[in-house]
């Protein structure tokens, strides 16, 4: 994600109107259906886009606004950095994770999942994240810092991948548009709160899981929609926690 401001430009309304026309007059046929393969970033321009089937995973901190009330800013910065650092490290360790974004206290990844086994792998990513939080909370307690609770949401669907920003400014970003991103974000905002477990997935994720992962999730109704939730952990990380976090 590129967001660094490299150069200051004088804004001119005439140039602005011309750029709007260039964008809005782009050919709809330049938006291609790539199905299950996420194209490389260098294939994106300011006038094209790719439709692709992906799995999105969001993780965010529960009640993060309350952390700002009870912690000094340097403390809060260290807590956030530790959380964000290890969320990115875990997602980045999986080859199928093609995009990672940080938005405030939320980290989300876009995963290429053309096979059923890939969907199981995303559940393994969620389990790693969940186990990592246990280790982080142990270290936070040792510092007498507040501990963190998180919510993780996972959804599979079709997204439109586009490049957005101001051409020539160095300020641009890959934007993922569609229900897959919005729904995964919504699930993360529900997970870990009230009676909900840490991890929530949709029905189209659940039906593609192996029997073992299915057995670790239970169903509930979210209005008229069935969801699945669990508190899945990574066994080797749990063993490390028991051995080293005493």
Predicted regions located by residue number:
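Catalytic NTP-binding/metal-coordinating core of nucleotidyl cyclase/transferase enzymes
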Residues: 42-124
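Serine endopeptidase catalytic core focused on the charge-relay Asp
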Residues: 129
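Alpha-helical oligomerization segments
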Residues: 186-187
